[in-house]
Regions:
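Conserved short alpha-helical segments that host acidic/polar catalytic motifs at enzyme active sites
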Residues: 1-137
């Protein structure tokens, strides 16, 4: 699950993500996100400004997806959503996908020819880097 705070201020995090794998992944993700609210007073819980400024996962945009690897690879690094971070807010990306690209090898090769060195070899991550490269131009 990912969350974006549209009104995030410079110097403060505005993109949050929790990922987990396994049969209890959804419960684990929401448990971690909800843990931020457990010790708050009723007044704090009712204060939208407090939530916006102080609480992770109290934002305006949310994304989540359950997807099993289509590449035969496993591990937390392959769990969606993927993030691509940048100091320019408009160049940050968050992506989930329900697709299986058949030309990953060609796109990966093109990205590396241009000087990129993608950290993960998966269709969704390659798509994220391709879109990020276009934003960076």
């Amino acid at each position: 699950m990912a969350c974006v705070k549209l009104g995030g201020k410079p110097g403060h995090e505005y993109m949050f993500r929790e990922r987990a794998e396994g049969k209890n992944a959804v419960t684990e993700i929401f448990g971690k996100a909800n843990a931020n609210f457990k010790n708050l007073t009723p007044e704090q819980l009712a204060d939208a400004k407090f939530a916006q400024e102080e609480l992770p996962f109290a934002g305006e945009l949310y994304m989540g997806h359950l997807r099993y690897s289509t590449t035969g690879k496993s591990g937390i690094q392959y769990v969606h959503p993927f993030l691509r971070r940048n100091n320019w807010k408009a160049k940050n990306l968050c992506l989930c996908g329900n697709f299986n690209m058949t030309n990953v090898d060609e796109i990966f090769e093109e990205l590396t020819k241009q000087g990129q060195s993608p950290r993960i070899y998966s269709d969704t991550y390659i798509m994220l880097e391709l879109m990020g490269h276009r934003l960076d131009r």
